[in-house]
Amino acid sequence: MKFFIFILALQQLYVQSFAQDFDFFYFVLQWPGAYCDSRHSCCYPQTGKPAADFGIHGLWPNYKTGGWPQNCNPDSRFDDLRVSDLMSDLQREWPTLSCPSNDGMKFWTHEWEKHGTCAESELDQHDYFEAGLKLKQKANLLHALTNAGIKPDDKFYEMKDIENTIKQVVGFAPGIECNKDSSHNSQLYQIYLCVDTSASKFINCPVMPHGRCDSRVQFPKF
C-alpha cells in the first residue's frame, strides 16, 4: 500500500515538473463564417457542416505579462479514449474547418499538446475539454448577440454594441479579433473571454489580446 502511494506521489511530481504556472486562460470562440470568408477554401468536418454558431478555438493558458507557455509536456499525448464521453459534444461545439475534411482528432491533439499540457496542474485531459464545453454553454454568445439584434446576416454592426452586449452577458469586457473578407471588409472573427485558472469563472482580462477591428464590422453569414 505504501509503495502504491509512493508511486502516485511520484506521478504527481512528474506532472507538476512539466506543468507551468500560469495566470489565466483565454477562452477563444471563433465565428465560422469569418473563418471561411477569409480563406480560399474551408472544409466541413466529416460529420457535416457545423451549426451556424460560434465554435471553440481553444482554452489557452496565459501570463499576466502577455506571454504564454506552450508544449509543456511532450509525454502527455492526446488520447481520444479519455474524452470518449465528450466526443459528440466536441464534434458539435469544438469543430475544425481546416482542409482536407477530417474528424477533428488532429485539431484536438494540437490544442491539448500545445495548450492543455500547460494547465495539467489544474486540469487533466478530460477536465480540460469538458471545461471548454461548459464555458461555451455558459457564455451562449450567439443567443445574447441575436437577442440584442446583432445577427449573422452579412450586415454591419457597431463594435461598441458587440462589446457591450458580450460584457453584459459574461460580466467583463471581451477581446475581439477581426479579419477581412475578399472585399476587405472588417468582420467579426474571434472573441476572447478571460477565465480563472480553474477554467470555471469569467474574469477581467489581465491583458487584452491584440485584435484590429474597424468601428463597424460585418457579421457574416455561415
From Swiss-Prot:
Its EC number is 4.6.1.19. Pfam families: Ribonuclease_T2. It comes from the Eukaryota. GO terms for molecular function: ribonuclease T2 activity; RNA binding. The keyword Hydrolase applies. May remobilize phosphate, particularly when cells senesce or when phosphate becomes limiting. PANTHER family: RIBONUCLEASE 3 (PTHR11240:SF75), RIBONUCLEASE T2 (PTHR11240). This is Ribonuclease 3. It comes from Arabidopsis thaliana (Mouse-ear cress).
